[in-house]
């Protein structure tokens, strides 16, 4: 597969959709697009003039707490969808220019038509750069899930210092696969690369987020819409 571009999709309860758009637009240095969808449940976060092409979208979901997923932009959605199915994915929904699929480990993702996006947006100091979707995967499904995403995207794997992580590197949005300690249902969250995590944490708190816990090289945060995400010690 030739992935031309990728989007981090922020999924939040529909009732919190406005709060999610406002917060993440501020985090990413962007403005919210006109709403799309039958209920106005989709929005793109468009970087301000000269800030690059969009790579973040927001969706209001009807059931559950939401989370995140990745959209892969390709030139041939039907062809790449068929290839994903051959690798073990399951087709959930399709229409012209869109295929919604489920990975072997249960993660939803989308293939969408590439619209010529190529300019990677810059980081917002000190908020960091939203550049990663982390797929939280049960131990029994983890190895096969890593193999699936590596084969699907063709993105190079970068060694990680901790064995529970596998990174598939790309821009503007890359994939981190995390092996969970228990057989929990699959989930996904957003990661931001932060040059100074303590400073970024203070910025996010001032913007309305709440710290949840600190890890070795990350801080788990809760956004104003109730979604979890991480600030991580990486160069933005």
Please give the residue ranges for each predicted region.
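Vicinal oxygen chelate
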Residues: 17, 65-105, 189-228, 233
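Core segments of cupin and vicinal oxygen chelate
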Residues: 1-53, 79-80, 86, 92-94, ...
């Amino acid at each position: 597969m030739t992935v031309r571009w990728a989007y981090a999709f922020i999924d939040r309860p529909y009732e919190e959709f406005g709060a999610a758009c406002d917060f993440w637009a501020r985090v990413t240095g962007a403005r919210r697009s006109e709403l799309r969808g039958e209920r106005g449940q989709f929005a793109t976060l468009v970087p301000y003039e000269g800030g690059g092409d969009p790579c973040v979208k927001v969706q209001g979901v009807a059931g559950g707490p939401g989370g995140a997923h990745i959209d892969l932009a390709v030139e041939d959605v039907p062809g790449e969808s068929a290839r994903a199915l051959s690798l073990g994915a399951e087709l959930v929904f399709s229409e012209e220019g869109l295929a919604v699929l489920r990975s072997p480990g249960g993660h939803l993702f989308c293939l969408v038509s590439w619209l010529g996006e190529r300019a990677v947006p810059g980081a917002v100091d000190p908020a960091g750069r939203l550049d990663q979707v982390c797929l939280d995967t049960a131990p029994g499904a983890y190895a096969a899930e890593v193999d699936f995403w590596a084969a699907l995207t063709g993105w190079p794997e970068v060694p990680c210092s901790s064995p529970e992580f596998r990174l598939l590197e790309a821009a503007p949005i890359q994939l981190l696969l995390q092996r969970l300690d228990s057989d929990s249902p699959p989930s996904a969250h957003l990661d931001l690369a932060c040059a100074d995590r303590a400073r970024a944490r203070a910025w996010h708190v001032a913007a309305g987020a709440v710290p949840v816990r600190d890890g070795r090289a990350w801080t788990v945060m809760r956004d104003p819409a109730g979604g979890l995400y991480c600030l991580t010690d990486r160069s933005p």
